[in-house]
Amino acid sequence: MIINHNMSAMFAQRTLGHTNVQVGKGIEKLSSGYRINRAGDDASGLAVSEKMRSQIRGLNQASTNASNGVNFIQVTEAYLQETTDIMQRIRELAIQAANGIYSAEDRMQIQVEVSQLVAEVDRIASSAQFNGMNLLTGRFSRTEGENVIGGSMWFHIGANMDQRMRVYIGTMTAVALGVRNGVDESIMSIETADSANKSIGTIDAALKRINKQRADLGGYQNRMEYTVVGLDIAAENLQAAESRIRDANIAKQMVEYTKNQVLTQSGTAMLAQANTSAQSILSILR
């Protein structure tokens, strides 16, 4: 028997200290819900988890971007619907004016309505905006000649660099549609039967241009809607994977915490017992 070093007490103290650390970690995990709260808990797991979190947040933002893109396209298409309706009405008037039963005075009255409708086409083009950006005045159109790109709208629809989509919207002013002269600003004339007849072809070309643009917008919108679904699924799956790495299994952690609490209580009792065992040596010295 020795009295200078109480090995039992030293062992009990060391074990109790380790158990107390584990109890503290258990409280931390149970209160936060995370298995990994700092790099020391799992260095590689933390690194992987943080990379996944970056991707998840990027995917969620990209989904929002794509949804904004759908809204952008829907607003543009709504303005083009108005322009289409106006052009259809102008076409009706041109066909009416091309009929030989009308006098010059009659055609002048028809021309008044046509002039007002053409002015409305320009008003729509100038007032069609999304977040302060003009949509139909050529800001997002291709520049003709030598296949040079003039402008476009970019939508970032991915979590990483260069994962984006380009959208083009042509110029839809009266000049671009051919119903107003770009030099002298004169409006397409239907004051004679022949001029009204020629105007029908001009309007058909304008409607073809508008319909082509609307078809393009429909394609853009469908793509973006599928993109939103894909991004949401990707974010959901990646979140599940990240959760398996970082989140705590509460049932498992509770079992571990309860075990460590019992060990703490028993360790405390055994440390007290080990400290008192040395006193039994005094009976030998009496």
From Swiss-Prot:
GO terms for molecular function: structural molecule activity. This is Flagellin FlaB1. PANTHER family: FLAGELLIN (PTHR42792:SF2). Residues 231-286 are annotated as: Required for interaction with FliW. Belongs to the bacterial flagellin family. Its main location: periplasm. Component of the core of the flagella. One of its GO terms (cellular component) is periplasmic flagellum. The gene is flaB1. The flagellum consists of an outer layer composed of repeating units of FlaA around a core that contains several antigenically related polypeptides. Interacts via its C-terminus with FliW; a synthetic peptide of residues 229-247 partially blocks binding to FliW. InterPro entries: Flagellin (IPR001492), Flagellin_C (IPR046358), Flagellin_C_sub2 (IPR042187), Flagellin_N (IPR001029). It is found in: Periplasmic flagellum; Periplasm. Gene3D superfamilies: f41 fragment of flagellin, N-terminal domain, Flagellar export chaperone, C-terminal domain. It comes from the Bacteria. Changing N237A: Peptide of residues 229-247 no longer binds FliW. Keywords: Bacterial flagellum, Periplasm.
